[in-house]
Design a protein with these regions (language model features):
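Short amphipathic helix-loop junctions that connect adjacent transmembrane helices
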Residues: 4-19, 204-220, 342
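Helix-breaking motifs and short loop linkers at transmembrane-helix boundaries and internal kinks
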Residues: 15, 47, 68-73, 215, ...
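Conserved MFS/SLC helix-loop-helix module at the cytosolic interface between two early adjacent transmembrane helices
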Residues: 34-73
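Helix-to-loop junctions at the C-terminal end of transmembrane segments
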Residues: 35-48, 131, 235-248, 274, ...
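Intracellular juxtamembrane helix-capping segments at the cytosolic ends
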Residues: 87-103, 297-311
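Symmetry-related core transmembrane helices of the 12-TM Major Facilitator Superfamily/SLC fold
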Residues: 138-156, 349-366
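C-terminal transmembrane helical hairpin of 12-TM major facilitator-type secondary transporters
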Residues: 249-303
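A late C-terminal transmembrane helix in Major Facilitator Superfamily
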Residues: 310-345, 349, 354
Length: 371
């Protein structure tokens, strides 16, 4: 997540328009799809440790390379590698979380996602601060090396608790089996893509929107992103306190509507106010992104938990298969959002799309009924 506050610089280095940058960025989903088709089976066959180490190395190297690029075609290739690495790492980590959740006998995935979001916010704050003082190449290179070493240390500490390689003889499992064993849970997949697009759109566009539309300087442009993910931390870490009083189904049904309406309303208001009061426009920007983040916070971990419960396959495989569908749909939706911003000349108009998708989750809330 360290490169998110640097998106305006990466976009400038590559000399791309909003539509081009958004499209090329979303092509990382192609690499993600390839990784998701196979990573779940690799975790099941080889264990979580090996997958995490290889994915972490590839992820850190690809981000470090991106910081130096000025060629759009090379960026596309490296971004696909980055997408594949992140997906493989994510699948192994979520499978490990399901393993711990099954042993604990309670829903802990939301809290794990909350801790992940804490890391994302800390990284964004640090990176936003570094924007003013350090060049992108030095910043990302040093951070990538440090992060990889930290990940290795954590993996070493967690090794006794990690998912071990399967003892079953699955040597006959071939390339064709990746597709024949594929299962789609249409309702959960639809709910997931609609529920996470506010989060993804915030990561992709909030910094660019604050800088180019609202007109705030570098470090202030990262604040909408930071506040959004701070709100998500509160939502994810606090979910277990609310659930005894309000069912997950009701949380999703009402929260998605409030979040979607608030997200669209305040972002559009900020766009209308920018010519009259930059301060008021900036405040509306902060509120809009934060509302969207808070009320969409529990959706991703909840829907992954629902998918795992509704499937008889190993958790790593379920996460991978869900991820494939999600990555394909994400690529399509991100591309639509990017070119809506390009052709309309307004990122605020483009943000209506993820806002409406969040509202639509209310009609799919029954997937959480039995959790």
């Amino acid at each position: 997540m360290s490169w998110v506050p640097r998106f305006p610089e990466i976009k400038a280095n590559l000399d791309l328009s909003n539509g081009e940058f958004g499209t090329y960025l979303s092509l990382g989903s192609v690499g993600a799809v390839i990784a998701m088709l196979s990573s779940g089976h690799f975790v099941h066959k080889l264990g979580a440790k090996k997958v995490l180490i290889v994915a972490a190395l590839s992820m850190c190297l690809s981000i470090a390379v991106i910081a130096h690029l000025q060629s759009a075609p090379i960026f596309i290739i490296v971004n696909m590698i980055n997408g594949a690495s992140i997906s493989a790492f994510n699948i192994a980590l979520n499978a490990q979380a399901f393993h711990a959740q099954d042993r604990a006998g309670e829903l802990i995935l939301s809290r794990q996602h909350g801790y992940w979001t804490m890391g994302a916010v800390a990284t964004a704050i640090f990176s936003g601060f570094m924007v003013e003082f350090v060049g992108i190449a030095l910043h990302i290179n040093v951070l990538s090396a440090a992060v990889f070493l930290i990940i290795l240390f954590i993996i070493k500490k967690l090794e006794p608790e990690m998912i071990k390689a399967s003892e079953e003889d699955d040597s006959d499992f071939g390339f064709k089996d990746l597709f024949t064993s594929f299962r789609i849970d249409y309702l959960v997949s639809a709910a997931l893509i609609c529920g996470i697009m506010v989060e993804f759109s915030t990561a992709d566009w909030s910094t660019i929107y604050a800088k180019e539309t609202i007109g705030v300087r570098g470090s202030l442009a990262t604040i909408p992103y930071i506040l959004t993910f701070t709100a998500m931390i509160v939502g994810r870490l606090g979910q277990h306190r609310i659930t005894p009083y309000v069912s997950l189904e009701k949380q999703i049904k009402f929260g998605s509507v409030i979040g979607g309406v608030g997200f669209i309303g305040f972002i559009c208001a900020s766009s209308l106010l920018v010519d009259h009061s930059k301060t008021a426009a900036y405040i509306c920007t902060l509120i809009g992104f934060s509302i969207g983040g808070f009320f969409s916070a529990v959706l991703s971990p909840t829907f992954f938990t629902a998918a795992n419960k509704r499937s008889a396959q190993p958790s790593a495989v379920v996460v991978g298969q869900m991820g494939v569908i999600n990555a394909i749909l994400t690529l399509i939706v991100k591309t639509i959002i990017a070119w809506t911003a390009q052709f309309s000349g307004s990122i605020a108009i483009a943000m209506i799309i993820p806002g409406l998708m969040l509202i639509s989750v209310a009609f799919m809330s029954r997937v959480a009924k039995d959790l």
